[in-house]
């Protein structure tokens, strides 16, 4: 395996100019500041974190949950140490402050873009994009933010496979919130798969692994379903019989009734 | 130190201590990482008979708000001894001792935690001593260090801590309960892996020489502990190797790119081929394009629909306007075209204009961040404008003078700047993708005042530079946006 695990304090390089993400420089040497996988590029040495919170950065697309509605802002929880501010002016159309709760109320989930992050970590969000909107159906699954790239997969291979295999729509927010929608059983299967991705994030061949997992689950479902179906049929039949017999008895009764 | 039983020998003549260790040996240490599911990072550590559980939370919003620091995170360290952790039940709650230990331990971590990365937040470290057997603060620091790393908090290095003391006149490493109680001194030390000391305390009496001697011991002890800590952490994050697959390399590449701090969130659509084949390493640009392109098609479709609808209505208007149009056309070829466009746009209504403005705004924003995005956007926008082209074509059939315009086009380059400008604009709207590039190439030759045109020129450059990548995008039939996915979606309008 060429993936080298580094932990805080590991020496990465002697070339100060190459210092990248997750590193720090001390005495003209680059050290790691995170637990993660060493990533060596021609001009940069960095660490791909394997743990850590989501820290918003500009233009991330995230899924947020409204926690407060103020006269001119919605305050959203974006699964980060900081709350996000969505100003009314960032809503696609003009909104009076009294109708704000009708549009987005506490508890509503929204896909948003991070518009700006300033040095004091004030997170400004925006909804002015055709891709961004309120989520009305489906569920939200949370995974660790550092595992988001695994859920997307190499160039989107994982996410497209998941979509194809489960017939669900998925949207992966950069903050680790994943929106999924589809049939109930599909959603269930998909969230299982997502949990599996999260648990096995560092393994190689993850996409194939998950593909097989989904196939197996489907097989199990198919195997288990016919049994249920038969059972149902049996009960149906017996019920029908009873009805039938009762019916006949009634008719016989009627026929036998001397009054007719 | 007091009332030591008469018959107790802490160190035998052959240098063995009560638990059979030598003077320079530490107690056996056992560490587990990630034992608490609700904590961001956690660690359970057994060191001799010490049992310590550490949970790390954060960075998270600091409460109360006045405790926040505008420029860095606050680190909060809470050392607490469970009431059952010692032989005589300890009074629960903070005591003078635990408050002090909390403070010095926090200060032991402050130099290494990169708190400035998380302004206004708090990093909470909770230490519970479940069973105490001397040296709990050092054990707690060792455990906290691992828990912090487990939580993904950036640190300059791990903190390692170990104590030495004086027992029966001898300097020994890592005291246990009896040695602590009946020894002459206890001297806990915490240090970074470079040997920089972040905590130092002393209880008892030691001479400078003894301290020097003891510090050497501690360094050795800390080195051993550091190795254990590192091994544990590496093991935690290690990839469980089962099958060695060829995919590893490209996968790593993907990880790098996607994990970069500011990727656009991806919504990728079904690409059946892709699921199976581990693609050739896709360059960053292509990936960026893929990501970027996902954003665009949605409003493109909308725009197209709108244009289609409204163009049909506007065609009649256009017909009537043709006469005017002809006259003007004779005077100057480019101008009527412009008029036509204007008329068209008026007819199409405000919505369309707004839509386009928005579109442009977005283009600019994205341009600043990802040039590829912009390229994608412009190219993808081009086709829908074919509608204009069609109408123009119809008009051209009817009007010879306008037909002539096409012939003049090549000459246009020699014509006035104004004319050229407008020509370029016409091309921009009218052209199909390849034509568009040509037009942009034309536009490139002139220094045009309009921002739009500038944009085009840069686009043209890019387009010329990377046409292959355009194609290589092939398998990535991007993208249906989630908002289109039938079951849900609707924008709030």
Curated annotation (Swiss-Prot), chain A:
This is Exosome complex component Rrp4. It comes from the Archaea. NCBIfam families: PRK04163.1-1 (NF003181). One of its GO terms (biological process) is poly(A)-dependent snoRNA 3'-end processing. InterPro entries: Exosome_RNA_bind1/RRP40/RRP4, KH_dom, KH_dom_type_1, KH_dom_type_1_sf, NA-bd_OB-fold, Rrp4, RRP4_N, RRP4_S1. Component of the archaeal exosome complex. Forms a trimer of Rrp4 and/or Csl4 subunits. The trimer associates with a hexameric ring-like arrangement composed of 3 Rrp41-Rrp42 heterodimers. It holds the Pfam family S1. PROSITE patterns: KH_TYPE_1 (PS50084), S1 (PS50126). The gene is rrp4. GO terms for molecular function: poly(A) binding. Residues 136-194 form the KH domain. One of its GO terms (cellular component) is exosome (RNase complex). The keyword Transcription regulation does not apply. Belongs to the RRP4 family. It is found in: Cytoplasm. Residues 59-128 form the S1 motif domain. The keyword Nucleus does not apply. CDD domains: KH-I_Rrp4_prokar (cd22524), S1_Rrp4 (cd05789). Non-catalytic component of the exosome, which is a complex involved in RNA degradation. Increases the RNA binding and the efficiency of RNA degradation. Confers strong poly(A) specificity to the exosome. SMART domains: KH, S1. Its main location: cytoplasm.
Curated annotation (Swiss-Prot), chain B:
It is found in: Cytoplasm. One of its GO terms (molecular function) is 3'-5'-RNA exonuclease activity. The keyword Hydrolase applies. Its main location: cytoplasm. The keyword Hydrolase applies. SUPFAM superfamilies: Ribonuclease PH domain 2-like, Ribosomal protein S5 domain 2-like. One of its GO terms (biological process) is rRNA catabolic process. Its EC number is 3.1.13.-. Residues 249-259, 383-400, 472-493 have a biased composition (Basic and acidic residues). Keywords: Cytoplasm, Exonuclease, Exosome, Hydrolase, Nuclease. GO terms for cellular component: cytoplasmic exosome (RNase complex). InterPro entries: ExoRNase_PH_dom1, ExoRNase_PH_dom2, ExoRNase_PH_dom2_sf, PNPase/RNase_PH_dom_sf, Ribosomal_Su5_D2-typ_SF, RNase_PH, Rrp41. Residues 244-264, 291-493 are annotated as: Disordered. Residues 297-377, 401-471 have a biased composition (Acidic residues). PANTHER family: EXOSOME COMPLEX COMPONENT, EXOSOME COMPLEX COMPONENT RRP41. Catalytic component of the exosome, which is a complex involved in RNA degradation. Has 3'->5' exoribonuclease activity. Can also synthesize heteromeric RNA-tails. Component of the archaeal exosome complex. Forms a hexameric ring-like arrangement composed of 3 Rrp41-Rrp42 heterodimers. The hexameric ring associates with a trimer of Rrp4 and/or Csl4 subunits. Belongs to the RNase PH family. Rrp41 subfamily. NCBIfam families: ECX1. This is Exosome complex component Rrp41. It comes from Methanosarcina mazei (strain ATCC BAA-159 / DSM 3647 / Goe1 / Go1 / JCM 11833 / OCM 88). The gene is rrp41.
